[in-house]
Amino acid sequence: MNVDPNITKYMIKAKIVTDGVVEKPDVVGAIFGQTEGLLGDELDLRDLQKSGKIGRIEVEIDTKKGRTEGYVLIPSGLDQVESSILAAALETIDRIGPCKAKVEIESIEDVRINKRDRVIKRAEELYRKMGENGKSLSESIVQTVREEVEKKEIISYGEEHLPAGPAIADSDSIIVVEGRNDVLNLLRYGIKNTIAVQGTSVPKTVKELSKSRTVTLFVDGDHGGDLIIKEMLQVADVDFIARAPPGTEVEELTYKQIIKALKYKTPVEQYLETHGMIEELKEWSSRNTKELEERQGNELKNERPEKINENEESEKNVELKEGSVQKLETVPEFDPSSPESIKFKLKQLYESRELELFDGQSSVGKFPVSDAIEKIESMHGDLLITGGIISQRLLDIAYNIGVKAIYGFKIGNITKKPDDIKVVAWDHI
């Protein structure tokens, strides 16, 4: 059924039934003829149609077995009240052509609802299309930014040309990650003191950096991360360990996840104790030391082979004398005023991962680094030597118990240091 598209508000739908055969012109004529003068001049159908307030009347009828049935559709631009009056007037029609007829209003539909439905549906289509275009545009922008960041900020560092952040050369503390994408992701959130090992084999550059910097090892939360931790602990000096959430990689972490992981990084001593790796690490250290000594011994033999075979009898005598001396040799007494004595003590504590508190020359107590802070809180002393990192918390506790000097293997992130306490790292003794 074709409906005038210019209708504005309502569609009056009336059902007609006649007891004889009629045609469309008969129906239209009956509508105009039998309602003329019924509703006054204001609602006269002819005038309303001329003024455009009533659209073209559409008639759909079908004749069967001597009866005619069908529908009449009248588009109305009138308001609800006027449209209802006009619809009621149609039901007064009792004859169409020569036949008796009955007219019944089935509905008065608000066509604006249909319009709104079409508007909503079309708006959804347009929004979806706009969203797809916007998404591709935003993805393009993100990719461009990533490329620019990578191009301008990632540098190649060391003889192995390792991917690193621009602050790697000047930072006292560094973050060691696995690959280039990890460095890029941290750069994206403003973390610039990073360097990548590019695999599980630790490069010489990273080993050398670990000797003079505070090192945080930041690895993926998978088996690959475990392997990198083990490798780094064997050949480099790691201070803290941070891990991505289980099953995730550093390169895919959000800013919030990165900050949380770095905030709750674990001191290496605590990590070793928690994971039962202390004995394993000692075994690695012993093996590495032995290999180094053997390598140095071989180099010495190659440099002076002629002296090794000279006067074997004299060598035996010397060895015998040295053996006698070794039996009588004792550990030198600790002297807090001697840098050599302090360095010797610090080396011992580093190897055993312990902390020792002194009052003058006397030892007040020696404890594992992992739980030493809680142990010394109730003690008193004037000198503290730790085989671990001098942290802000350790410094605060030491100051509170009267310590005047702290010696440690490394100095961590100290933001507040009292003027009357001395803080010294291994390489400054």
From Swiss-Prot:
Region (Disordered): 287-322
Annotated Mg(2+) 1 binding sites: 178, 220
Cofactor binding summary note: Binds two Mg(2+) per subunit.
Reaction(s) catalysed by this chain's protein: ssDNA + n NTP = ssDNA/pppN(pN)n-1 hybrid + (n-1) diphosphate
Record SMART domains: TOPRIM
Matching PROSITE patterns: TOPRIM
Positions with a binding annotation for Mg(2+) 2: 220, 222
GO function term, MF aspect, one: poly(A) binding
Listed InterPro entries: DnaG_primase, Primase_DnaG_arc, TOPRIM_DnaG/twinkle, TOPRIM_dom
Domain of life: Archaea
Named cofactor requirement(s): Mg(2+)
EC number per UniProt: 2.7.7.101
GO cellular component, one term: cytoplasm
Keywords: DNA replication, DNA-directed RNA polymerase, Exosome, Magnesium, Metal-binding, Nucleotidyltransferase, Primosome, Transcription, Transferase
Family annotation (Pfam families): Toprim_4
Location of the Toprim domain: 172-246
Matches recorded under Gene3D superfamilies: 3.40.1360.10
NCBIfam families, sorted: PRK04031.1-1
HAMAP family in alphabetical order: DNA_primase_DnaG_arc
Family statement drawn from the similarity comment of this UniProt entry: Belongs to the archaeal DnaG primase family.
Subunit structure as annotated in this protein's UniProt entry: Forms a ternary complex with MCM helicase and DNA. Component of the archaeal exosome complex.
Descriptive protein name: DNA primase DnaG
Organism: Picrophilus torridus (strain ATCC 700027 / DSM 9790 / JCM 10055 / NBRC 100828 / KAW 2/3)
Gene: dnaG
